[in-house]
From Swiss-Prot:
InterPro entries: GUN4-like, GUN4-like_sf. GO terms for molecular function: tetrapyrrole binding. Pfam families: GUN4. SUPFAM superfamilies: GUN4-like (SSF140869). Belongs to the ycf53 family. This is Uncharacterized protein ycf53. It comes from the Eukaryota. Keywords: Chloroplast, Plastid. One of its GO terms (cellular component) is chloroplast. PANTHER family: TETRAPYRROLE-BINDING PROTEIN, CHLOROPLASTIC.
Amino acid sequence: MNRIRFISLILNLDSCDSNIQEYSRLAYVHDLNKLMDENFVSLLLIILKLAKNSKRLQPTYHNVYLFNLLKSYALSEIDGYVLGHFSRGFVNTLMHYKNAQYETLESLLSANNFFEANKFTQQILLELAGEQSKQRNWMYFTDVHSINHQSVSDLNHLWELYSQGNFGFSIQKRIWISVNKNWKKFWKKIGWINSNSKWLKYPGEFMWAVNAPPGHLPLFNQLRGVYVLEFIFDYYL
């Protein structure tokens, strides 16, 4: 497969390949590392521009990966284009998120700074839940009703995209359902408790990398009860 065909396939610009599944495309994307050189980077930038101009560029796992791969090459042409057209972040630019804090969150996730991204996510949720939640720095189970559905969906979307589908509330919900909503099994499955059913110590014993167990992040304090997270699973996703 030649390089133009390869990238067009990944970006879903070729309609005859539109039925290829997301993870199949992602497998192709990872193979790009074997082809990368300065000429190929320039070609990738051209196709990115074409995709954005045609309004066919979508915030998907593979496109997020490609965009980050492109940014990793310190070329003035790339830096100029990214600054001029994606200054709010790749996903924020395409999705037109209204909450400016999501730009900061996307920047942290894009840099694989999952520790700070987790803290910032909790901060956003507390602010969305209301001033009292923010002041006390945790939520009562009644506070979660103040958070609107779209905000949770947007947060979840960013986590999913920048972890290639490994993190996010929707991933956690899927695992929770897979263990018949048994919380202890859920916590063990996502790596919040150890084999002796003891809670991991924050922050040192948790994993802050994309290869952590599925659903490991973002963290949610379960010592105050499961209602808030259960409410998010049941009503927001």
